[in-house]
Amino acid sequence: MIDRERDSLVMDVARLKDELESLRDEDNAIGSITSPTSCEHVSVEEGKKIAPASPGEHLTSERIRLFLSFFKGRDDVYARLWSSKRSGKEGYSPACKNEWVQDICEKKKKMRCASCPSREFIPLTDETIMNHLEGLQTIGIYPLLPEGRCHLLAIDFDKDSWREDAVALLGTSRLIGIPAAFERSRSGNGAHIWMFFSEAVSARDARNLGCYLITETMSSNRNLPMSSYDRLFPNQDSVPKGGFGNLIALPFQKEAVDKGNTLFLDDDLRPLPDQWGFLASVERITPGKLEGLLREANKHGQVLGVGTGFADMDEQPWAAKPSWRFKSPPLQGPLPESIIAVLGNQLYIEKGGLSPALLNRIRRVAAFQNPEFYKKQNLRLSTALTPRMICCAEDFPHHVGLPRGCLDELIELLGELGIDLDLRDERPLGIDIETSFRGELTPQQKAAASDLVSYDMGVLVAPPGSGKTVIGAYMIAARAINTLVLVHRRLLLEQWQQRLQEFLDIESSLIGQIGGPKDRSTGFIDIATMQSLFRKKQVADVVTEYGHIIVDECHHVPAISFEQILRNARPRHVLGLTATLKRRDGLHPIILMQCGAVRHASGLRRSDDSQALERTLIRRDTEFAYETEETDPFIHDIYDRMINDEGRNSLILADILSALEAGRSPILLTGRREHLQFFASRLEGNVRNMIVLYGGMDAKARRLAMEHLSSIPDTEERLIIATGSYIGEGFDDPRLDTLFLAMPVSFDGTITQYAGRLERPFLGKKEVLIYDYVDAKVPMLLRMYKKRLRTYRGKGYREV
């Protein structure tokens, strides 16, 4: 009896010792997550040696429930890993009962699974999780729920610096008080930082928490890239049309675990000894705590830490109050008395001695939120390939490079911080040229030129017909150094050639061109198409040889090829010319970064004759309707049906013939070549002179069309039919007085360009007319008209 009791006590003591040892292991495991940061590299092979027993062993229903209680996403569908034996490629797709079933599965037709009419998704079950943990399959979940909520947030790190970046962010989460878990990814060459919520929260709030963590981490880690903002799970606030949002692979997959991967790590990148114990110990973030964290983050502007630009402004951005610019919180810690910078093709700031927080602030001078990301998100389109942030800063081993136009903002930032800028100017002076301006500027043009000549770089914003090319010629004479004029179309190249010969007192042989049939540069004054200077992703060396660069229609600068040309050029003077600074994609800040601030705008007037014109908008309501079962049809589908609508087209044709009978000089604009051809064929023989112009015309056809146009007497009937993209920029025909807008647009910059074709002064011109065809029975097209109407009214048009 005593022996049995003694044996029982011995067993109890042994059991208690085991439990105590287990608790110590768990305490050490959890303690390692809060130990001092270390980024000692641990290879996959080392990870395999020190990996604990596989989480897939000794599985119980309790452990599966624990797993599912943390890794919660959609339960009506999950993603399954596939691999191709032929190509070796891998990927994930929604698990579907009909996958690759002959005559049912639509994958071969490139149809998205979420849109497939034959889809029959397999729900996520305990058995599915069991198979994943035992290594029978690899699965991922879709964290974003249909109602725009989520139970978790994850941040992915997959660059070469993933170890340092992940550990740095983990350190930030501790400082802020956000519980997080550090997992090595399936490949072994990346990591996930996981955060879990006690209940479903708004995906927007969860993602803002992730952005806040990244922004704060950048103040202590100088190498964390801006692209980190695009590595969140979920990656958008609402479920995109035809999809589920991004997926994330689940941890504890047995095959990966056997290699030391998909396990939770300590700061030394070693797998924790008790994976299940650690998971059970992870604290979940309550909605109240999340709300408090975001309130503090928003108060200090630290969710993204950059401004929004002026993408959604209706007013002119150059006239806006400074409050649109982002106000950063004060920097903590010691700051240098001065920083050293070199101004060349970019503004190079020496990194030496600068804290990560200051470097981060400097980089953000050249960063802004990407309006296209938010536009797609609001339309419930996928944002997978659309970055949330645009950063034009460039990192070099010992310098940070900012675009030249950021100099003023950098000086302002450093002034606020009490730091002097020691700037060395390494821009070449250029080659002196002898020329003079032989024209006469109007008083308004003189005022603009006076503002521009006071600065090394800047932008002139002026309406069509105000003489921007003439001002450009004046600036060439005023600078008196060799000049490169950049254009994006051959038509503009030819116009600049003519205008410079007209307004500059210089031998025509010294005005060269790069691109086009007469490719001959002089090194003194050259006009170049952007395409001729950027071939095979390489910028031509010649761009570095000019002391003065003029960028015509500079609102095209954000195009990657155009931006690269300016990024590599080293001019002392840059002048941007445009009628509208705003872009549909919201990338306007890049224009200012490359060309400098707006130095003169809006006050520049056209000639008195142009100002005296009466502007009339004639609204023509159509009967066009678009009936579909889709609640939100694609615009191109609407356009396809609209351009073939007989009633609508007949209305436009009748109006054109009436205008011609009234002796007007009209132009019809459409966005589709087939629409243009329809009107050309129907009007053939009914118009004395008809000129058809469109993008993609060969040089000979374009030259013959323009010669025909210029040969028509002012008193003779004529009609121009063109695509809007061809006419929008550089087309100059003062006789035009009537516009037929045959296809709807909404962007105010486009309307400004189109209306500008009519508003050039011409003898006897007293009134200009715009016929706008309003498709009020199609809600999307009616909304577009309302946007156009605001622009018309702003330009002084009276609606009748």
Regions found by a protein language model. Give the residues of each.
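Signature for HUH/AEP ssDNA processing cores
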Residues: 37-38, 54-189, 196-212
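DNA replication initiation modules
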Residues: 138-170, 198-321
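Conserved helix-turn-beta segment of the N-terminal RecA-like "Helicase ATP-binding" lobe
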Residues: 214, 491-517, 684-687
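Conserved pre-motif I regulatory segment
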Residues: 391-395, 413-416, 422-461
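Conserved helicase ATPase core of P-loop NTP-dependent helicases/translocases
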Residues: 494, 510-521, 538, 677-678, ...
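Conserved interdomain hinge at the start of the Helicase C-terminal
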Residues: 630-671, 678-681
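Conserved RecA-like P-loop NTPase helicase motor core
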Residues: 695-794
